Amino acid sequence: MNSGGLEREFFIYIPDNLIDSTDISPLVMNFHGGDGYAEYEMEYTGFRELSESENFIAVYPQGTVAEGKGSTGWFTGIGCNTAGEVCDVAFISELIDALVSEYYIDADRVYASGFSNGGFMIYSLACYLSDKVAAFGPVAGLMYTEELDNCTPDRPLPIIHIHGENDSAIPIEGSSYAV
């Protein structure tokens, strides 16, 4: 799909029992970490198998390549980060709208989880898409201090935060740029 002038990719998994169904189903979006790929995340998380037993549609959006870095990730932070023309929050908002209109998805049961850089993206979605995402599950990802100071969700948010105490890459206590 095109978002902000960029061709964006995602993988979708519809359980066998929902392919021909007209039942309204939840949507679970899962975000890969930095240097990651949606296809790997789809294989790694086990959400495909879980969706078969729990009757939800799983979607794995693909981040973009950061200019100068050469690796994939999510541009998180205040709305649309200053990283060129990429606006991942807008992409996810448009993706949710497209999926809800094309598939039998309950717009009130859209959930988001993500690992590491994907967890940072989850906090951005909590700040800016609280009207579209029902609950949030960041794993080993934090919120930028600047974002915390400017985060004004539309409602109280259900969030489950999972983080290891021995994480040296993204310490749970945060750093000078993240809390």
Model-derived segments and their meaning:
Residues 31-33, 116, 162:
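Conserved beta-strand->loop/alpha-helix structural units within folded catalytic cores of enzymes
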Residues 100-157, 168:
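Primarily recognizes the serine-hydrolase "nucleophile elbow" in alpha/beta-hydrolase
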Residues 169-173, 179:
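Conserved alpha/beta-hydrolase "acid-adjacent" motif
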Residues 161-163, 167:
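Short beta-strand/loop motif that positions the catalytic acidic residue
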Residues 3-14, 18-111, 121-124, 128, ...:
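Serine-hydrolase catalytic machinery in alpha/beta-hydrolase-like enzymes
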Residues 27, 158-160:
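Protein kinase-like catalytic core scaffold
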Residues 16, 95, 116, 142, ...:
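Residue-level signal for short, function-critical loop segments
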